[in-house]
């Protein structure tokens, strides 16, 4: 195939796109087989079959009391009447955020979102050498709370301070505003003085002893539950909350049912942290490629020795997360890199440039780059982006066309898998809960920046027979960990 340098094509767009069509028509058999391996099972008609299989696993998790998926939490179903002033603490993996939020009373001239005012908000980076949750850590949090409260006049610091928390670590939940600190993640450890202590009591005692402040923790949520809390207040049509960034998760509210294990029902309605990443085992046979197997060899086990949604792998003692591995921002770039390396070896791409960086695991192709290539239809811009990323002076047009084809098929499969999960949850919720316009609230860098990925998910869902009579939209719930915690506190006050 004759190589064409894109640097010679900076002319009128009509001529330029004509040239692109000519190049793409020379698609290689290797590329064709790769595209086929990612997309052969992707069709709207298949959503019914595969969503039924995911639904079956979700129901098993609920019925058999899975300890790692469909985790129960106290329900938050805002009515829109919630109001008041709240202190919010949001502890994530590397950031502490503290805010004061004012939710005004319902007013005919104000939408629900317009009633929410973040009076003050400040964040602090938590360094790796400070990631020990002990008494001193809570004193540090207390000092930042005091700093925030002393710099505002919305909350009366001499009165009881209603507080909401977004806590991005596991808790042994004992009530809607109580949970024991036992296990952490994201590089943190727990001090002996805090282990098995109640988060509400530790925080309230620290602020009272150190600063004479009286906090009343009304609600404790994790990040996915906070999306649901904030989203349901802002949009009464919201039925699901989704996180899709470096990982994937969903959250939904379910009514009491004989199909749900009694231990998972905390009240007449329970909010479930679904841990969606652990589902999707049924998709391995028809959707997994050799590249997925390179990332996690368990994709090759068509008859797995365990249920991914019920327990860790008994052999490796690690979790297997099929949904996350095929859809999330951590793995989409690595899948792309692995395919590109195969095409390099086959002599199909990047033959006239230094491609050694492509051989670097989890670094040879960045998330920013896959997003740029997928979202951008200006081949000049993609050319310049690739040259800047890899230190090239030029890159062939056929290379760019091939790369876009690779990225497109990987994103197409990912969008189908996410849509399939949404359909499964629609079936779980049932027709009584759904109808007309339905909103799915979301957060996460992938859905926020991959606009075409997001649109493709919506198109798949809305074209499915199982979603007949429903029109789905994905809605970004901005600042959900702050707003959701405030709404949670207002709901339970």
From Swiss-Prot:
GO terms under cellular component: cytosol; mitochondrion; nucleus
Organism annotation: Candida albicans (strain SC5314 / ATCC MYA-2876)
Q: In which pathway does it act?
A: Carbohydrate metabolism; hexose metabolism; Carbohydrate degradation; glycolysis; D-glyceraldehyde 3-phosphate and glycerone phosphate from D-glucose: step 1/4
EC number(s) stated in the UniProt entry for this protein: 2.7.1.59, 2.7.1.1
Provide the family line.
Belongs to the hexokinase family.
The UniProt induction remark is:
Expression is induced by N-acetylglucosamine (GlcNAc), by the alpha pheromone, and in filamentation-inducing media.
Tell me the protein's name: N-acetylglucosamine kinase 1
Q: What does this protein do?
A: Component of the N-acetylglucosamine catabolic cascade that phosphorylates N-acetylglucosamine (GlcNAc), and allows the unique ability to utilise GlcNAc as carbon source. Converts GlcNAc to GlcNAc-6-P. Also able to phosphorylate glucose, glucosamine (GlcN), and mannose. Galactose, fructose, N-acetylmannosamine (ManNAc), mannosamine (ManN), galactosamine (GalN), and N-acetylgalactosamine (GalNAc) are not phosphorylated by HXK1. GlcNAc metabolism is closely associated with virulence and morphogenesis, and is involved in the cell wall synthesis.
Q: Where is this region: Hexokinase large subdomain?
A: 222-479
Transmembrane regions listed in the UniProt entry: none
């Amino acid at each position: 195939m004759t190589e064409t340098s894109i640097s010679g094509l900076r002319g009128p767009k009509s001529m330029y796109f004509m040239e692109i069509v000519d190049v793409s028509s020379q698609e290689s058999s290797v590329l064709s087989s790769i595209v086929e391996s990612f997309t052969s099972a992707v069709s709207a008609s298949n959503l019914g079959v595969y969503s039924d299989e995911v639904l079956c696993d979700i129901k098993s998790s609920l019925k058999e009391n899975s300890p790692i998926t469909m985790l129960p939490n106290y329900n938050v179903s805002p009515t829109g009447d919630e109001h008041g002033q709240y202190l919010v603490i949001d502890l994530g993996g590397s950031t502490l955020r503290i805010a004061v939020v004012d939710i005004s009373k319902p007013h005919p001239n104000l939408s629900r979102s317009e009633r929410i005012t973040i009076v003050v908000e400040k964040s602090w980076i938590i360094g790796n050498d400070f990631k020990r949750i002990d008494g001193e850590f809570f004193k540090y949090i207390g000092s930042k709370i005091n700093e925030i409260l002393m710099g505002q006049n919305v909350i009366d610091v001499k009165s009881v301070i209603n507080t909401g928390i977004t806590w991005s670590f596991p808790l042994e939940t004992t009530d809607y505003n109580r949970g024991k600190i036992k296990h952490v993640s994201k590089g943190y450890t727990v001090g002996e003085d805090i282990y098995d202590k109640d988060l509400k009591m530790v925080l309230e005692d620290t602020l009272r002893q150190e600063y004479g402040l009286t906090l009343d923790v009304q609600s404790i949520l994790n990040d996915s539950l906070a999306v649901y809390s904030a989203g349901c207040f802002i949009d009464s049509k919201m039925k699901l909350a989704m996180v899709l960034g470096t990982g994937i998760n969903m959250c939904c509210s379910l009514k009491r049912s004989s199909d749900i294990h009694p231990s998972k029902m905390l009240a007449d309605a329970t909010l479930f942290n679904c841990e969606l990443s652990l589902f999707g085992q049924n998709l391995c046979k028809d959707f997994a490629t050799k590249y997925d197997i390179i990332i996690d060899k368990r994709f090759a086990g068509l008859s797995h020795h365990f249920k991914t949604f019920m327990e860790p792998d008994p052999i490796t003692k690690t979790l297997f997360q099929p949904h996350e591995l095929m859809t999330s921002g951590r793995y989409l770039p690595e899948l792309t890199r692995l395919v590109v390396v195969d095409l390099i070896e086959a002599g199909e791409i990047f033959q006239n440039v230094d491609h050694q960086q492509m051989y670097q695991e989890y670094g040879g192709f960045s998330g920013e780059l896959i997003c740029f290539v997928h979202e951008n239809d200006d081949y000049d811009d993609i050319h310049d982006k690739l040259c800047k990323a890899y230190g090239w002076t030029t890159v062939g047009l056929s290379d760019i066309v091939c790369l876009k084809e690779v990225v497109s098929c990987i994103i197409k499969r990912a969008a189908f898998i996410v849509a399939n999960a949404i359909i499964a949850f629609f079936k779980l919720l049932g027709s009584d809960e759904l109808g007309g316009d339905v909103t799915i609230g979301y957060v996460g860098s992938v859905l926020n920046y991959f606009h075409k990925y997001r649109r493709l998910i919506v198109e798949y869902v809305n074209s499915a027979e199982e979603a007949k009579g429903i029109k789905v939209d994905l809605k970004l719930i901005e600042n959900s960990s702050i707003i959701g915690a405030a709404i949670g506190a207002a709901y339970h006050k």
